[in-house]
Amino acid sequence: MQLKVLVTSDRPDEYVGKKGLVKNQVITCQDVDPSGYRLLMPFDYTLSDDEKAKYAGKLLDKQVVIGVRELVPFGGRLRARGAIISGPDGKNN
């Protein structure tokens, strides 16, 4: 599913996992679908290494389109898995 979202937070995230320290760049997204049928709760999305190089620190208060394959619980919040389809400039990746 494709979601047009507003990025409300763009931050580094660190935690200790099974294989040691894990460092990610995480954005918090609020669905802004123009149809009015929106997700009520904001969700987190972890940037891939390619996306991190391109977008880290540049998405705050911008709208992007994210292709979501699944929403999974992570630390009491929902975290999306997928890819950024179009960036804040409206161009496809």
Predicted feature descriptions by range:
Residues 13-18, 33, 73, 87:
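Acidic surface patches and DE-rich sequence motifs
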Residues 16-46:
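OB-fold (S1/OB) nucleic-acid-binding surfaces
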Residues 5-9, 60-71:
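OB-fold and OB-like beta-barrel modules that bind single-stranded nucleic acids
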Residues 69-93:
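OB-fold/S1-family single-stranded nucleic acid-binding modules
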Residues 1-24:
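Structural detector for short beta-strands of small beta-barrel domains
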Residues 47-66:
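Short nucleic-acid-contacting surface segments enriched for D/E, G, S/T with interspersed K/R
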